[in-house]
Amino acid sequence: MNKKTIAMLGAGSWGTAVAIHLAKIGHKTLLWSHNPQHVALMAEQHSNPAYLPGIPFPENLIPSDNLIECVQSADYVIIAVPSHAFAEIINKIPKPTQGLAWLTKGVDPASHELLSQLVASRFGVDFPIAVISGPSFAKEVARFLPTALTLASNNTNYQKKMHQLFHHDNIRVYLSDDLIGVQLCGAVKNILAIACGISDGLGYGANAKAALITRGLAEMTRLGLSMGARQDTFLGLAGVGDLVLTCTDDQSRNRRFGLLLGREVPIPEAEHQIGQVVEGKHNAAQICAIANKNKVEMPICEQINALLHGIVHAQEAVNNLMSRPAKEE
């Protein structure tokens, strides 16, 4: 594939890591941040000390705070902002020429809609989109360690182009057309990672964590099937792959947030200690609202949402789950 110009909108750890990957394989990559001071620091240090310290930028990775200029000068546009900022970004940018891809995992907090629904409302239902998801920590991608991802799209031609853009010796990309399933996996797994962190923080051990992962997978699959997703998506990289990674490894900020809650650290202090956006905290209420709308039981997510809103404490949430009526698996 000919080398392209990429606009990466969002200079957190994940957006930066993927920008580094794309630049390393030869694409000119514009890394946008809304914060001019952040951009100046990245340009000065040729790295992102705030979110991905110690990993140098390739020469063709260029920080910028000019959103419109980045989009207009790019062949491909990728969004990597947190889910609560996604709507603001797509409403500010001009319509990209090729399509729009995103790394963001979550749902819109205002409308409870999937991010693909927001894009369809803004740019049209036939506008090419792609969602990139799967088990992937930023530091490992930035260091060129082996990673496998799922790329879901509504347009096979655009999907092929995005596949060629990303695919390399260190990143293997698998294709899907299940946009609903891939997006739900990315949102729900963060809530379940908080649950696993809480369990470990309480000292409940490996058995409890395995149960939370397994029953959590059942919850997210039920929700997905009720919304038209395919079951095999939840058994793939975007589903069980990302779920296991996020629930078991302390690189996950959602899991670390849960660990702190399990150790009775207050929510504001736990967020402060994490120092970055905890998507599961932002998306718990939205996922529960979507589940209620679709008449789907999601007891783990419901207990985490109740805990985050001060209705129950960590020990209570676990007790409520363990005391539920017996049922068939």
Swiss-Prot record:
Q: What is its EC number?
A: 1.1.1.94
Q: In which pathway does it act?
A: Membrane lipid metabolism; glycerophospholipid metabolism
Where on this chain does NADPH bind?
A: S13, W14, H34, K105, A138, R253, V277, E279
Q: Which residues form the active site?
A: K189
Q: Which residues bind sn-glycerol 3-phosphate?
A: K105, G134, S136, K189, D242, S252, R253, N254
Q: Which UniProt keywords apply?
A: Cytoplasm, Lipid biosynthesis, Lipid metabolism, NAD, NADP, Nucleotide-binding, Oxidoreductase, Phospholipid biosynthesis, Phospholipid metabolism
Q: GO biological process annotations for this chain's record?
A: carbohydrate metabolic process; glycerol-3-phosphate biosynthetic process; glycerol-3-phosphate catabolic process; glycerophospholipid biosynthetic process
- What HAMAP family does this protein map onto? NAD_Glyc3P_dehydrog (MF_00394)
As for what it does, the entry says: Catalyzes the reduction of the glycolytic intermediate dihydroxyacetone phosphate (DHAP) to sn-glycerol 3-phosphate (G3P), the key precursor for phospholipid synthesis.
Task: Please state what the protein is called.
Answer: Glycerol-3-phosphate dehydrogenase [NAD(P)+]
- Could you read off the lineage of the organism from its UniProt record? Bacteria, Pseudomonadati, Pseudomonadota, Gammaproteobacteria, Legionellales
